[in-house]
Amino acid sequence: MRHGHPPTDIHHGINQGEPMDDNVLRVGIGGPVGSGKTALIEALVPVLIERGHRPAVITNDIYTQEDAQHVRRTLAGVLEPERVVGVETGACPHTAVRDDPTMNLAAGAEMLERFPDTDTLLYESGGDNLTLTFSPALVDLFLFVLDTAEGEKMPRKRGPGITESDLLVINKIDIAQYVRTDIGIMEADAHRVRDDRPVVLTDCLTGVGIDDIALYLESRRKVLI
């Protein structure tokens, strides 16, 4: 039986509807512009496939298919290009994944109809601010991606994306020293404002931390699916 997120408060933008009762884990991936959401997907998909999963990807951009095209190019030979679909939202990113996820729900349903073997559906939001969350009608859980270039102060700014996401990802740890970010402080503050809910440090370009994310998703799959 699927559980997903419980009914949520104003920060989530309450959305009607129950998640579908199937064996697909639906994962939202949000975060600011340039934090590495697309890079995370491109690093995570091969690991999921290697671990026996059958992922598909739905990206969100306001006006273009840029992220979907990038994912297809990067994962050529790894993931069938038809398993990557871009949604042009024409609106603020949080609208399409939280307030009115109709377009994404339709894209997901079409993807599952076309590829019924899919067991993991990744929804990438367009870049947004710290208030971004996902509708429980759309996803079972969501990840929020920060990066060290934004500064070690970011976790202390809180916001629902940081405090309420199921998993917080701190990306680009490889450049922390060059942008004068103390990873230790950033990670400690993240744990503190999240009441010790999980935080993963990643370098998506080299794969550091990606196995930890895959293991986390598998652990949640056992509970949610």
Curated annotation (Swiss-Prot):
Single GO BP term: urea catabolic process
Assembly behavior: Homodimer. UreD, UreF and UreG form a complex that acts as a GTP-hydrolysis-dependent molecular chaperone, activating the urease apoprotein by helping to assemble the nickel containing metallocenter of UreC. The UreE protein probably delivers the nickel.
Subcellular location: Cytoplasm
Main location: cytoplasm
Signal peptide as annotated in the record: none
InterPro entries named among the record's database cross-references: CobW/HypB/UreG_nucleotide-bd, P-loop_NTPase, UreG
Name of the protein in question: Urease accessory protein UreG 2
Family of the protein in this entry: Belongs to the SIMIBI class G3E GTPase family. UreG subfamily.
Gene giving rise to this polypeptide: ureG2
Functional note: Facilitates the functional incorporation of the urease nickel metallocenter. This process requires GTP hydrolysis, probably effectuated by UreG.
Annotated keywords: Chaperone, Cytoplasm, GTP-binding, Nickel insertion, Nucleotide-binding
